[in-house]
Design a protein with these regions (language model features):
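Sec-dependent, cleavable N-terminal signal peptides
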Residues: 1-30
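C-terminal PAP-associated
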Residues: 27-486
């Protein structure tokens, strides 16, 4: 959910435009030989970026990205509630992206009005539809419900369903697709004590007739505001649905005043989303550790191995499961120097045992200081790490910095309750092309650059660098190094 600060900034733009030590942690790794090209995306439909016209700028944040099985990348980002959602497509391995029509408005304007435009997520079908395309689905938060927009022609047109959630009063929707026409949306229901529901459609988003509760009868205590939702994933081979989250560790902790969300969970459905069984990925014995930062993340590789990535506000860990989420490996640390702090992770899995992970990282570290209170000297980058043997205990991640500096100073991770700097908002993403194996990262940046590939938009000046006036959604596409497919 976006804060009033985000809405105020959008209004201004419209006017201008008219870890615990009780378990073993693997920290071995190596510097990766990867290369990335970076550029800003456009906001006007039909604009291809990068270009030499100085019109590749936008004011969007909290982006998402996916790749279809043909190697096309699709991405979305938000302009804030009532501002609408922006979408892009790349057909050349992420070297260029074209701005599509907004998924939740028929308007051709770059800043059209829409009740949606809050939290956004994106999914692509795993099988072709009758038109020879992979359906593309974009979820957009409108608070009263979740908008789900479907494109059956490769992003050319969209069909909008404004009732993608069956339970009203929603927050933080996630979306995942399976087969040619199944799509599921998960979300927090604020009116139902922050319960997590998964609503599914079997007709490409036209109707959402099936709703399941992510909490099984033995874990209903995870509701009652004792959890924080993570993303949703579907294994296209066995059709299992996986909902990630953080929460308390046991029913007895519902009355514990000093217990944080020190456990990571995965809700598993083997019946298409009708029912779920909740499995503990990791429960830290230190109840003061907090994993409820944006966001616990789950991904599934082609062999059905599952990876869950999570941050304790300073370091980044992953656990894997080779038995469909029933049992889990001990957590292993991913980040290494110079990323002394690692937050807001996202992952994508490819071939068996192959995993890419991205996060916002800085060389600054202070164990007693949250990133929200980091000094102005703390420089943040997008970090990229890859493990080609991620189901092997003790295996190494190769790590590199994928972007220029994207932010200085504090980074708030408390969503709408933020009192500090929220320019990076809550999440970003990475996808990998099944045809090349290489990654394309979509991320937020609040720096004034004004270069050919990152021109300054209206209102973004050198004096406003590192503020929300310069917020934009950018791309970092991998151009060399190993990939994760096949």
């Amino acid at each position: 959910m976006n804060s009033s600060v985000r809405l105020l900034r959008l209004s201004a733009v419209l006017l201008i435009m008219a870890a615990s030590t009780l378990y073993s942690i693997n920290v071995r790794g190596a510097t990766g030989s990867f290369a990335f090209t970076n550029y800003e995306l456009g906001s006007t439909p039909g604009t291809t970026c990068p270009n030499a016209l100085a019109n590749c700028y936008n004011f969007a944040a909290e982006p998402a990205i996916r790749a279809d099985n043909s190697g096309n990348f699709y991405a979305s980002s938000e302009n804030g509630l009532t501002g609408g959602t922006v979408a892009w497509k790349s057909t050349d391995a992420g070297l260029h992206y074209i701005t599509l029509q907004s998924p939740n408005s028929a308007s051709a304007g770059s800043m059209q009005f829409s009740p949606a435009g809050g939290d956004t997520d994106l999914a692509v079908a795993s099988l072709l539809n009758g038109n020879g395309f992979y359906n593309v689905y974009v979820a957009s938060l409108a608070l009263t419900n979740v908008y789900v927009s479907t494109s059956s022609d490769g992003g050319g047109t969209w069909l909008l369903n404004p009732t993608g959630a069956s339970v009203p009063g929603d927050d933080r929707p996630w979306i995942a697709a399976d087969g040619a026409s199944k799509v599921c949306v998960s979300y927090h229901s604020i009116t139902a004590t922050n319960d997590i529901f998964v609503t599914c459609s079997t007709d490409a988003g036209t109707t959402f007739a099936q709703t399941g509760n992510a909490f099984d009868p033995n874990h209903l205590w995870l509701a009652s505001f004792q959890n924080k939702i993570g993303n949703l994933a579907i294994d296209s081979n066995n059709h299992n649905i996986y909902q990630s989250l953080s929460g308390i560790g046991s029913a007895t902790e519902t009355t514990c005043l000093n217990c944080s969300l020190h456990a990571v969970w995965l809700a598993v459905s083997t019946d298409g989303g009708l029912t779920f069984t909740d499995h503990a990925v990791f429960v830290n014995p230190d109840t003061s550790v907090f994993y409820g930062h944006q966001f616990v993340n789950v991904s599934v590789d082609q062999a059905g191995n599952i990876y869950v990535v999570f941050s304790d506000d300073h370091n980044l860990y992953y656990s894997f499961s080779t038995d469909h989420g029933t049992t889990w490996s001990p957590p292993s640390q991913i980040n290494q120097s110079p990323s002394s702090t690692a937050i807001m992770p996202w992952s994508v899995a490819g071939g068996a045992g192959k995993l890419d992970v991205v996060w916002y990282g800085t060389s600054y570290y202070h164990a007693g200081t949250t990133p929200d209170n980091y000094p102005s000297s703390a420089a943040w980058y997008v970090f990229f790490a890859q493990n080609l043997q991620a189901t092997t205990p003790g295996s190494q991640f190769s790590q590199t910095i994928a972007t220029p500096i994207i932010h200085y100073g504090g980074v708030c991770e408390s969503g709408v309750t933020c009192s500090g700097n929220r320019d990076l908002y809550d999440d970003f993403g990475v996808a990998a092309s099944p045809t090349s194996g290489l990654a394309s990262i979509i991320y937020s940046d609040d720096q004034y650059s004004n270069t050919a590939t990152q021109p300054a938009g209206p209102g973004c000046t050198s004096s406003r660098s590192n503020t929300s006036y310069c917020d934009s959604t950018n791309i970092a596409t991998q151009t060399s190094g190993t990939g994760i497919f096949p």
